[in-house]
Amino acid sequence: MTNLEDRLQQPMTGDDSFLYHYTSLSSACKIFESNSLKLSNLTNTNDPLDFFSPENCGFSSCGDIDYKKVFYELRLSGQKRRNYVRMLCFCKDLFCTSEEWKNEKNQDFADNLLFKGWARSRMWAQYADNHSGACLVFYKSEFQKAFKSLSNDDVEILSDRAINYTNYLAELETSLEDINSGARVIYDYSSFYLEEDKKKFLFQKCQDYRDENEYRFCLINRALNSPDEAMFVNYGTSLKAVILGQRFSTSLNLATPDNVEQFKIMWTFGRPSLLKIK
């Protein structure tokens, strides 16, 4: 085994160095050609917490306000949120505490490697062309540096983190609905949905998505004028391996970069393993 191959198959109490990005074969080819990943916008995500338009949900207030002005500015703020916010989504490995490790079921779970970010069968089905695409393995600390390099006067980098999965939505609703929250009086609501106390909700999803075990990078780019305006990040040398799906056609030759290792995932009685190709 290579050092990387060994690390990718370590027990679940070990390495937190890698992030995993599932993609189709056609998208993988574009990624390798450009050495970059395309950031997603909010409108094309699957979770309603991301793609919903908060300005259409109304607001609560007290005192005398100019409703026409507030409605206009909240709509403008909602459009800014859709235009400016970009993200990249990865899977990460699951880990057990030393106490959890004593559980016999957890030890069996570790033996079959289903805790690994590259071994999520539903992700292979949904995002990697039903097991015929690829899973890209990035070194986390190197990709963090690449992502932070996007920062400039227009681009605000939000701290990358694991997604918080919860069905408790009262805090989100209050934050986005109460225009007088925080015992403050503001007169310009045109950036209301991008204020500091609301940014943490860009890292929140409903519990129905918890099996994705997502790790998200997010930024606000105020130079963008449309949700469809493309933005990319050059990942430098952070791509360390490409894992091909079990249904990846043997007649195809995926041209991966020379310094990137290549594996194929194999499923035996539902247990995943890696076969070194390059």
Model-based region annotation:
Residues 1-278:
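Partner-binding and oligomerization surfaces adjacent to conserved cores of proteins
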